[in-house]
Design a protein with these regions (language model features):
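N-terminal signal peptide c-region/cleavage motif recognized by signal peptidases
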Residues: 25-27
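Cationic-aromatic interfacial patches
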Residues: 31-164
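Well-ordered beta-sheet/strand-loop patches within structured domains
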Residues: 29-61, 160, 182, 186-575
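Histidine-centered catalytic/metal-binding microenvironments
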Residues: 140-204
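Bacterial N-terminal signal peptides that target proteins for export
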Residues: 4-17
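Intrinsically disordered low-complexity regions specifically enriched for long asparagine
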Residues: 15-17, 143, 298, 303
Length: 575
């Protein structure tokens, strides 16, 4: 039966190719001119016959350039093995979810249906061209989505270094002519280690989720501590075994061994501790409210987090070959790398970031205190820095305290100055000068010292947001699991280690010299011999070769991106 079906498909394909050549002959003749005119007319229209909404001007211009390379003839039917090439493309669309993409965005079912119809009929020239150009349009969209992402990063307030422009016209044309569409798609994937690891994790989590008829749910009668007993320990162990399995196709055991020791101890406690550490919780193995919420989070939610994180990684250019620094806001962590091989980090430390929605009770301040997402280059360090206080903090927080306590400024090493120069002379806190602080004619800064909010050092990468990395006297806050306490700048847990990393190419800067500079009497500025790229990023899922870590969506960016992707997909609906 299979041989008969295959033979029939081959006959249909041969019939289709002969029919295509009859309708669209090559060479300078009337038939060829008719094909050219029909193609040009189709590509000059505002919308494509297969899609409800108009395509963009950029898409139309790209398609026009693509078909001009082929003298406005059929592209996909002009190769040696068109059937295999078209099937390869449709299979690529079917597998789009494994890339964190949506198959319907590329009209997968519509094209698959039309492909069957074409092979079982005598299509018109218009039908051939509509199908051919639909393949090209969706391939362009797929490659663009895979390489650059579906939503512009600036639309989501991600201000990142733009990626290098890609000549999609020549690449698509070459891929079709050489029948290598799959290879081109592979080449368009981000090469970032983080992306590839998330892609692997996505496959695993999809496999796990497919096994469940309903989400896994645990309902312990009380807080479960190591050594406690519960009938759900076996179920918990099976679930965590599947999550921690190195296999890409792990199985969730549902038939719990009645002989299992239902005492919460041993390896299952270790796995819970690892889970807590991955989610920035205290890794004590105690299953309380927060840990229970983690365990009961549907796998579909984790899949969405992975997909959204992959989307954001598509926005990033290739990482620099030399050292670079990454801050992931939801993870409250900083990593410093010697090279662009992300799996080999040189430093890994806690950070404190700008306040989240939950931390901001005032609706108007919800976004103003968040740490922005952008990239830059650390170019110099400031030891024993002054803190030049932003006007918003001055008027909203400090001056109201001064009005209640006239000694507040002096007790906190705060001084009024005409400008922020190191040589500026402090002015008295007279009523007249206080009024000039309100009107921005004078400024307030904090002197270097143990009370200084920036600690003993700050790491400067000039930007439009006045954001930098810095030390802090408030080291107790690093013991918290959720560390969103700043006004936007990023406080680092181990500033001396980060300084040693940053000054690696500056001759003579040893640990001892850094310590001396941090505790000297006067401020000093040190320019880096080699600027270090820094990326302030936002990803609620990160994967390594051993496990996936998920983080809370503290700024609600996942929700915003998910909405933008859904709205964008509505604009790509096929008839």
């Amino acid at each position: 039966m299979m041989k008969t079906t295959t033979k029939k498909a081959r006959l249909n394909a041969n019939h289709l190719l002969l029919w295509a050549l009859l309708l669209c002959p090559l060479g300078a003749n009337a038939g060829n001119k008719h094909t050219i005119a029909t193609t040009q007319s189709l590509l000059q229209a505002n919308s494509h016959p297969y899609f409800i909404n108009a395509y963009s001007l950029k898409e139309r211009e790209t398609l026009q350039s693509l078909y001009q390379l082929n003298e406005n003839q059929l592209l996909w039917f002009s190769v040696k093995h068109p059937v295999q090439t078209i099937n390869q493309l449709l299979n690529l669309y079917a597998a789009a979810p494994m890339q964190g993409l949506i198959a319907a965005d590329y009209a997968h079912l519509k094209l698959k249906k039309q492909w069957r119809t074409l092979q079982q009929s005598k299509p018109s020239l218009q039908q051939f061209l509509a199908f051919d150009t639909a393949l090209s349009l969706t391939f362009l969209r797929y490659l663009n989505d895979l390489h650059d992402g579906r939503v512009p990063p600036k639309q989501q307030n991600f201000y990142l270094k733009p990626k290098s422009a890609i000549d999609f016209v020549s690449r698509i044309y070459t891929a079709i002519k050489t029948e290598s569409v799959f290879e081109l798609a592979q080449n368009m994937e981000p090469k970032l280690h983080s992306y590839q690891q998330l892609k692997i994790a996505l496959k695993k989590y999809r496999h796990l989720n497919a096994q469940l008829k309903e989400p896994v749910h645990f309902n312990f009668k009380h807080t479960l501590r190591p050594g406690d007993w519960s009938t759900q320990v076996g179920k918990l162990q099976n679930y965590l075994n599947a999550l921690n399995s190195p296999s890409l196709t792990p199985k969730i055991e549902t038939n719990h061994n009645t002989k299992i020791n239902n005492t919460y101890t041993g390896s299952v406690v270790t796995k819970v501790r690892n889970l807590q550490a991955d989610y920035n919780l205290e890794s004590d193995g105690i299953i309380g409210k927060q840990t229970l919420e983690l365990l009961n989070t549907p796998l579909s939610k984790r899949i969405e987090q992975i997909e959204l994180s992959m989307e954001r990684l598509r926005w990033l250019p290739e990482q620099p070959s030399g050292p670079f620094i990454l801050v992931n806001i939801p993870a409250f962590r900083l990593w410093a790398y010697n090279t662009n091989k992300e799996q080999n980090d040189n430093l890994n430390m806690k950070v404190i970031v700008g306040k989240s929605y939950a931390a901001n009770k005032d609706e108007d301040k919800k976004s103003s205190l968040q740490t922005p997402i952008f990239s830059g280059n650390i170019s110099y360090l400031v030891f024993r820095p002054y803190w030049n206080i932003p006007h918003s903090i001055l008027t909203e927080e400090i001056l109201p305290l001064f009005e209640r306590d006239p000694t507040y400024l002096e007790r906190n090493d705060l001084e009024i100055v005409a400008n922020f120069s190191h040589r500026a002379t402090p002015l008295p806190s007279t009523p007249e000068n206080i009024q000039q602080l309100y009107s921005k004619k004078l400024h307030l800064r904090q002197r270097p010292g143990r009370k200084n909010a920036l600690g003993h050092i700050k790491f400067m990468f000039p930007n439009n947001y006045n954001i930098y990395l810095h030390d802090t006297p408030g080291i107790s806050l690093f013991s918290r699991t959720k560390r969103d306490f700043s006004h936007g700048c990023i406080r680092v847990e181990n500033p001396s280690a980060l300084a040693l990393f940053a000054l690696r190419n500056n001759s003579g800067w040893t640990e001892q010299k850094i310590a001396e500079a941090m505790y000297s009497d006067a401020p000093s500025i040190v320019d880096l011999e080699q600027k270090i790229p820094v990326l302030i990023f936002y990803s609620t899922a990160l994967a390594t070769q051993s496990r996936v870590s998920f983080y809370p969506d503290i700024y609600d960016h996942d929700s915003a991106l998910s909405t933008a992707i859904a709205e964008r997909s509505l604009g790509l609906v096929a008839h």
